[in-house]
Amino acid sequence: MEMHLLCETMFTCRKNNILPVHLCILLDDVIHKEKVKAIEGIFFQCVFFKEKLVYTEWTKIKFTYVLHDLVISQIFKNACIKEVIHGALILSVPINIDNLHFDTDILILKIIYPHFLHDDIVIKLSEILSGAPRMQKTVEKKQEVEKPFFHIPAKLGDLTKEDPISFNHHGPLEPPSTVRGLKQSANVRHSHPISRPEKANVTFLSDSWYSQNLKCDFISDIQQRHVLVIFWYELSKGIQMQIKNIQIPPENLFSSITNYLDRVNTYLDEIAERTFRCITTNMEIQNRHLPQKFNSHFQIEFNCTHLISGMELARDFWILSLDRNSCVLKAMASHFLHKKKGRSSLSSNEFWADLIDCTTGKTLYGEKVRWQLNSETSLYSTFRKNQNISWELQPNCYALYMSENLKLYWVLPGGFCVSGTFKLKENDEFFFDWQFGMS
């Protein structure tokens, strides 16, 4: 756990109100080994209740990971844990403990991957701090060294006494403070032997770090998707800190948790409504005339009257599992990233795509798709990673495409398409700064 030792040393230099929380995120089906290798960064944010809810700024933290099994009791001599950890993310979080409210305050960890993918882990601070042990401070005896490295003799006269000066040296005729007539000894010099310090026994912090007492707590995040291990080291600064829990009115209980989840879910609901309002509006503008834009195959028994009911079914499947990986949000994130930093996430013929299979009810969100035009038919075919045939060639499959310049395409079976421009609102940029600003 060198990462914990490094962060402990860094946090010790900070203010006394900063609590170092050392933890591991166990690998699972969501955060697995291949996904861990692609992590671009980890950020944290706290939500505190101080008369009103306060969201701290996103702060990047150091991390490392292990993909092999860890036996903590073999690493730490005095660890009270026998479980084997099958791979983990290892990190430390500095938390401000001023005015803590255990009932409301939460910690949010955001793990960033390429292509605007991220995982949010929301943890109650009370879950973290409830297991903190009350250990007595370990006082290590200082090594007694008889003579320090820079040795100053006890008698200052040895350092301040001037050497006699020989007349044979081309100095002044008479040395200062010399009484005339006093016989001087020529070429007399006093030697001062160099004081060498005795070899001291040096104890490194890492030696004591691995021999200290250690307590581990297993906790889960709010959504019960991940398991985390909290490490309480005997030598950690956090063991000695006094943490005070401030009570709040009952009506404000769990306000930060619900506020965070509601901010995300409410915005996703709004995006779903705006997306299909854009589609239906442009369908009316096109007078319900849907041009064929993609190369596709028709089933022999295909009935065009089923298109409307199929559209409603595909819409419901899309909304049912809608999350921040949707092509609409990724296209908006690409748009704001290009606007602020001049970076393009897509080439001219690439789009973000949500692919809906009405046969199985499953939706693939946020796929990167490339369009290729057939010069003979003037129809497009789509290509993506691990795709054998164009999505539009599969029956009962719908697609939603969106470009970096916010051009939206709703594609039906048969390659028919409704297109329009997705319009931004004032709160969009604020949401994306909050959720994607660190990308």
From Swiss-Prot:
GO biological process, one term: chromosome organization
Chain ranges passing through the membrane: none
Keywords: Capsid protein, Host nucleus, Late protein, Viral genome packaging, Viral release from host cell, Virion
Positions in coiled-coil regions: none
Superkingdom: Viruses
Protein localization: Virion; Host nucleus
GO cellular component: host cell nucleus; viral capsid
One matching Pfam family: Herpes_UL17
Function, as annotated: Capsid vertex-specific component that plays a role during viral DNA encapsidation, assuring correct genome cleavage and presumably stabilizing capsids that contain full-length viral genomes.
Family the UniProt entry places it in: Belongs to the herpesviridae CVC1 protein family.
Subunit field text: Interacts (via C-terminus) with capsid vertex component 2/CVC2.
Name of the protein: Capsid vertex component 1
Biological source species: Human herpesvirus 7 (strain JI) (HHV-7)
Gene: CVC1
